[in-house]
Amino acid sequence: ESVTCKACEYVVKKVMELIDNNRTEEKIIHALDSVCALLPESVSEVCQEVVDTYGDSIVALLLQEMSPELVCSELGLCMSG
């Protein structure tokens, strides 16, 4: 598993925890903004990169009720299966 894959799955899982199944675009964006700050500095950079690069796509995919694994493989960050 790549670091980017792990970062992506972490971001998506944390966002889902933070929004507590209340999937609105606004809530997801707000959660994306805060999620990397919860990490140690060494990983928060990769986290921020994922958010900066894929944030819009993550929002769109989460609004389609996708799981973290599916979101990240859709983005091409994780190998599916």
From Swiss-Prot:
Keyword Glycoprotein part of the UniProt annotation: yes
KW NAD (keyword) present: no
Glycosylation sites: N22
GO biological process entries: adenylate cyclase-inhibiting G protein-coupled receptor signaling pathway; epithelial cell differentiation involved in prostate gland development; lysosomal transport; prostate gland growth; regulation of lipid metabolic process; sphingolipid metabolic process
Cysteines engaged in disulfide bonds, as pairs: C5-C78, C8-C72, C36-C47
Entries under Pfam families matching the protein: SapB_1 (PF05184), SapB_2 (PF03489)
Span of domain Saposin B-type: 1-81
InterPro entries: SapB_1, SapB_2, Saposin, Saposin-like, SaposinB_dom, Sphingo_Act-Surfact_Prot
GO cellular component: extracellular region; late endosome; lysosome; membrane
SMART domains: SapB (SM00741)
Keywords from the named record: Disulfide bond, Glycoprotein, Lipid metabolism, Sphingolipid metabolism
Stated role: Saposin-A and saposin-C stimulate the hydrolysis of glucosylceramide by beta-glucosylceramidase (EC 3.2.1.45) and galactosylceramide by beta-galactosylceramidase (EC 3.2.1.46). Saposin-C apparently acts by combining with the enzyme and acidic lipid to form an activated complex, rather than by solubilizing the substrate.
Protein's recorded name: Saposin-C
Origin species: Cavia porcellus (Guinea pig)
Gene symbol of the encoding locus: PSAP
